[in-house]
Amino acid sequence: MLIYKKKNFGRRSVYNLKKCLHKGFQINSCNIKAADNVLHSKASAFEKVNVVDKESIGNLQHHLDTVLPKKKFQFLRDPKTNDYKWDEYLSKILPVDKFNFGLLSKFRPPSEDEQLQKVANSIGAEFVGSTSSLTGLMSQLHFFISKWKFPNFSDLSKGFYISPNERNFTRLCRSASSVHISYQNGLYCIDKDKSLTKEPSVNIILMNVGKSLETFFTVDKDQFLLYKKPPSSNGVLKPLKDVFQYGRCSSLLVRSQLDCYDKKIPESGVFDLKTRAVFGVRMNQTQPELFKSYKLTHYYGNRISFEREYFDLIRSAFMKYSLQARLGYMQGVFVAYHNTSDIFGFQYIPLVAMDRAIHGSSEIGEAEFNLNLQLLEKILQYATSIFPKRSFRVMLSTTEDVPNPPLKVYLEVADDKENRGFDLLDGQKNLEAKTVSPSNFCALEVCALQFVNGVHKSVVKHLDEKETWSIKYHFRKPRDQDNLLRNYIRLRDDIKRRESKISNPPESLLHDYYACSEQYYKRN
């Protein structure tokens, strides 16, 4: 029996409700009662598996912990007085060719992490993943659940200009996401889809700078000398420990690496450490010699300012940062801004600030995270029922230009060692070549309706801490599998092009930005 109040639904909503809901589903003003295809935000969706010794987690060195309580951007060197607020030692970045990356522990994807798999077997988990392999999928689920809600820029100054085409998340952030699931001894291990990444990556410089700076900020001066090539000290190297937090959502086990701990941070005291290349570097990766020309000199404004960097973080990085923080039970992120040569300043961004920008409030952010993770686990379970005990790829994609779009789930059987290539020069050739066998492919759609305390909502814009947000969903297999297969190949081709593309903004724009920065430093 279906019970609803007419005043709560428009004609289209009633039609969709009758079309999508299964029999036996009951709605009233207080609760939702149904079978397994209803998710609740109040459910204990994500739980800690292990207890972490916080003393083993790294700490910020060089008095950088003084940044944490302020929550606002702090210049390393005051642009007006030229006085250093912290040790001048922090201002220069060691060139990547002088840093011994061989001393750092190597990243292990879930399919190669024996300890992660051991933990999974001990608790009876079926799926294992890491924050880096899951956040892309969870970003697509955010867009699906939120109905493509735009980010909130209320923390920016009133004078900051936002053009109409910059009010949404970046194109890369919005693009479809793909992972490879490796079936090993009863476990499904979720790795990044390496077949879509061109090697070497165009971001290799920024990645290496980030790795060296994470060490730079968490060891003292004497220890850091030992990471140089050749070592500048005869001391004994104290290797940095890898500390992991494991969390579980039903049959899904997630690994999160913990970077930093400080008792001044409320609750867990754990936070993430991020390094952020400034606008001029991100937009001009083909000319490393110009990296040092772009400097941050202002707090506010659209150019050469901290505010510009914060604006770009909201559009491109906060989604990933906030998901990683929640998956690792972290309270925020410490961000260092640089141009690969100089460090300009630091900021601690708490999770509540990222929630405000992405979701509008922490209540919505926390509730959506629980729903997001539950839905992801259900999708994985459904996918393995189609291709049981097989290795395969999963791609999630949702469209922003149609009302109430379904979530598309593309599944493709792919062996662990398979690394199918695409001709980047000819997308039509990829379509005609039938690079994916129809017998090893399946496309699904996820349809969903949302409710707050049993009342249907097209979009959840506000949520009280005491309210329950629920999602009623179901899977369907569209008939036009051939067209969906072609669409899947197009999406893969598009992702690979974007991954391989080097940013080349108009030369006049870069010249304008660089000129502003250089003129400021000449005057001062």
From Swiss-Prot:
Superkingdom of origin: Eukaryota
Coiled coil: none
Signal peptide: none
Keyword hit for Cell division: no
Principal subcellular localisation of the protein: mitochondrion
Keyword field: Mitochondrion, Transit peptide
One of the record's GO cellular component terms: mitochondrial matrix
Transit peptide: 1-12
Any Gene Ontology biological process: mitochondrial RNA catabolic process
Localization terms from the record: Mitochondrion
Pfam family, one: Pet127
Family: Belongs to the PET127 family.
Annotated function: Required for the degradation of mRNA in mitochondria.
Protein name per UniProt: mRNA degradation protein pet127, mitochondrial
Organism: Schizosaccharomyces pombe (strain 972 / ATCC 24843) (Fission yeast)
Lineage, uppermost ranks: Eukaryota, Fungi, Dikarya, Ascomycota, Taphrinomycotina
